[in-house]
Amino acid sequence: MPKGGQDIKKIVVTVIGADRVGIVAGVTKELAKENINILDISQTILDGIFDMVLICDMENAKGSLKQVQDDMGELGRELGVDVRVQLADIFYAMHRI
């Protein structure tokens, strides 16, 4: 688990919605366009529900975190899924067991 501050450039992207063609392609294409590197990716489909979590490095990103959040949110609307982007430290703190 990340220690405070050391992973400030790491983000977690979550994607949830009905499974359909093009979700992975759309999300990864947008991240590449933003110059965001994917460090880890996990994807499952359960009973027609698509779920994907990506750990990414945005150290060399073209835009700010807010811009990436807005762009990915718009992409999610286009794809018919919920896409959320948050700092890794916040994600880990919210999902601590």
Question: Where are the regions that the model predicts?
Answer:
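A conserved regulatory-domain signal marking ACT and ACT-like small-molecule sensing domains
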Residues: 2-97
